[in-house]
Amino acid sequence: MVLVKICGLMHSEDILAVNTAGADFAGFVFAPGRHQISLEQALSLKQLLHPKIKTVGVFVNEPVAEILAIYQAGAIDVAQLHGKSTPTEITQFQQAGLKVIQVFERQAIDLTSMADYLMVDSGKGSGQLLNLKAIPHISRPLILAGGLTPLNVRQAVQLVQPTMVDVSSGVETNGHKDADKITQFIQQAKEDIIYEDIK
């Protein structure tokens, strides 16, 4: 069954929503932008999070030492790396016990990446849906992000068969996380898919 990450969590009510809906991963954004939170906020939110939900820190070209400091403070279990990341940097994180998601825009996936997960995204916060049919089927753990909503995630899972789907603005109303949309998204993503075109 596909895993679900709800990203851009900022408030205690966001945490309550992902706890109730049964998300697998919760995303805290440390990179500049409207969802950015501080280490102190992340630690406070993590205390409210169900213990089975793993936390992912989102970074854009952040120095290795700063990411490791956030990990060692106990705020994150996984680092999601946008921008340029070298194999040496990824290995440094992994040797410290931190799992790594490396993000690739559109279909430009580097299968030689040392990361634990490869994410294909339509571009930082663009909200655009990728051309799902152009995404290659790979044997590596793949995360699908960008433009997903409760209305299209089921079809996206069916077409791409990712390990995980990732959503932020697609479960928001007026710029704030919407508990009903989070529940709908997770239900749609995890619903058993019947391949109706197979006779």
Swiss-Prot record:
Pfam families: PRAI. Pathway: Amino-acid biosynthesis; L-tryptophan biosynthesis; L-tryptophan from chorismate: step 3/5. GO terms for biological process: L-tryptophan biosynthetic process. Its EC number is 5.3.1.24. The keyword Isomerase applies. This is N-(5'-phosphoribosyl)anthranilate isomerase. It comes from the Bacteria. GO terms for molecular function: phosphoribosylanthranilate isomerase activity. It is an enzyme of class 5 (isomerase). Belongs to the TrpF family. It catalyses: N-(5-phospho-beta-D-ribosyl)anthranilate = 1-(2-carboxyphenylamino)-1-deoxy-D-ribulose 5-phosphate. Keywords: Amino-acid biosynthesis, Aromatic amino acid biosynthesis, Isomerase, Tryptophan biosynthesis.
